[in-house]
Amino acid sequence: MSQTAITLAFEQWKASQAVTGEPVLLDEFVFANVPGLDTSKPIDRNEALPPAAQIVHRQAVSRKGVVNENAVVHSTVLGAEVGDFSFNWIGLINKASNTLAMIVHAPLQQKLKTKDGQQGNVLTRSFLME
């Protein structure tokens, strides 16, 4: 089972952006392999990015859109040229400020690239924020 949370840091940053009139831009997904991650427990909304040694991949947001007046979606596609790594933690950030907006704790997943005649896998990840 996966767990999802919008961080308190994002809520504060979003309010700050509103005050200054600057856009709220979430532009990068971060994939990590966090040892001992318990996906059955709720996420602490104060959680930060994992240490650099646990981050296995970063990928730009490829699509975003408004679902309704209270929800937006951000998506990325990890193509067959990306890999090999395993991940159980995904975050959505504003790259310029390094603000972590949303977190998913998930069961361990593999991302394999195409090599030596073996077809890799293609993964799409989408985060819906309400």
What are these regions (language model features)?
Residues M1-E130:
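N-terminal assembly/attachment segments of tailed bacteriophage virion structural proteins
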